[in-house]
Amino acid sequence: MKVFIFLVLGLAVSSADTDELEIIDVDEVGQPKDITEINRASNLSDDILEAPNIQRSSINDDDYIWESPVPYVLENDLEINAKGVILRAFDEYRLKSCIDFRPRNEEYYYISVRKLNGCFSYVGRIFSGQPLSIGRFCDSMAIVQHEFLHALGFFHEQSRYDRDDHVKILFENIEKGFENNFEKVNKTDSTVSGLPYDYNSVMHYGSEAFSNGNGSTIVTKDPKFQDVIGQRQQLSPIDVKELNRRYKCKSTTAFHMFCSFSNESMCGMNTCSHSDNDSGWEMVKQAQGGPETDHSTLPTASSKNGTEEGYFMHASTASGEEGETSRLETKMMEPTRECHVQCLQFYYYHSGDESDILNIWIREFDDQFDSEGTRRLMGQITGPQTSHWRIHHVSLNATKNFQVEFEARTGAGNSSGGFSIDDINLSEIECPHGSLQIDNYMESNNNKSIIYSPRQYTIDGYAYRIAIQFKGAYFSLRMQMLSGENDEKLQWPCLQRQMTLRMLDQTTNLQLHMSAERSFTTSPYDVNNLGLNLWDNPRRNGTEVVDENNQTAFAGPLSGYRTFAFDDLIQSRNYVKGDSLIITFSFQDLNPLIKESALPCPELAPVMIAHPPLDLDSGPCVRRITPVTRPPPSTTKPPRTMPPKTTHPTPTHSTTMPPKTTDDKSIFGFSPAMVASPVLTLLLALMLSMP
């Protein structure tokens, strides 16, 4: 739900020009509303429903536990923005647990997600079509995760039977009629799964929940957690542990790999090089030309000094001839989800020459007999050096068993460094559509100017950019439609598109992230004081600006969040790391959700490769051992299944494979079928004539 605040500001879009641009914020001044505030305004005393004629559900009872994937229906009364947030929340569950969700087919038990009066759910699986309400103001990541945790069988954290050892409930400060929200759950009806009390749980009330105005209702016995309880970013790591233990998860639905090279572990990766001096990827603590330390142990705003010494992988380009390469390849992974889309996230540091190149490939294997595989170039990094570790995302679309290859290639110039990588994560969810990294954060925070991202394009051609402005105690975060090269071909206004802005938690392991994100969706009802739709073609109702390339463009209103995050949140966890703050963003088409409960599989945007490699593929660094013989052909053909539609990156150069000398893939490198039959006959005769 959006509340529009109209402002007009003079924005510096270049060192020479300022233009008056309309600013239309979708947030109210202050923090987003919490569940208790939303429900109190709706005259609801709790966000937990009690089923009539059914004993209160217990997370100790397996009868109330769902089978995964959990069937659901996004009902028509849901706001379109809420639908998009719910699907994003499902991806977080998939990333961190074995819980999956799917649109209902004919299952008896399912969750009916509706827009009712407030935010609420039953605890556990109760009956067919049980309602879960994401009402007005409830469409945030944390609230959606909170309500679905109820549906999965979890009570509030402060309702634990052992809560009195950790918090004190001040009943005299609770508004009359709301005392039941602070009842404890009986030990026989619940379990804590052997985990400690979690002040950081997304299921914990805040300190002022249901206050009558006389002070806090919850006081932590350890004062340092008083401002922690009630966080509304994401599931905490302990929330995830408890969920996985309760559902006996052995693995996650959508996570494949994490490697920070800590304890000098290569995580099953292999290296090889094609150079005369045997230089290649090495595990180091620091590298000539930089960086001086790994990314994992960089100091954060919440821990000013890095206390550990870590490792990262470095490939030097300081010696060797132009075109020499060194490769780092991951272990083999198997796509498991119906949508064949993966996201590779890593941090890199470039201290070499601007002509040096880091190529990112995937190598797919047809079956267990394929030891060579076929590789495709999915991304490329080149250009000027970096002064900080920088985040990078590469969208993948592997349909078979695959591995990722990082290939460092020496350029034509003089290098004194090379490429370094650290903190690799690979998952089966869609990558963010872009990122904006603010290095030298402390300096930027004291500078009140606006920082813009480069111009971005959606998969179907709409142009936009992101704008961040620091205000000392908080920062503003907005997006802005721009004129682009496809404007005449597009449908205007640009409607039912969800903009998600995320302040990234830079914790090394993606599964431990508690990023802060907020989403809004473009609507036909978003109009300014002149009655013009905010999302119309900027060439019609926009203002002339100068973009990052000093090119003239037209820009629509800036729209987003005046107070995206306050300083106390920014300084917590790992939001600022190595003096860098990272914003990721996605601009998602939600039009299919008007009638459906799921989105189609994501399409990959075309990838621009500046320097297509010309050399032949020499195969993987380590060839796996394949079976000696193939199984006999099947007499019946299995039904052919087609993978979901994806758009492959636009090919810029074809990689030529060397011709195979034989179709037999025996580990011995030759086939008996290639031996001439007269020779076999002679050998057989000699054997028979021997005494």
Regions found by a protein language model. Give the residues of each.
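Short, surface-exposed tryptophan/glycine-enriched loops
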Residues: 193, 384-402, 409-411, 516-581, ...
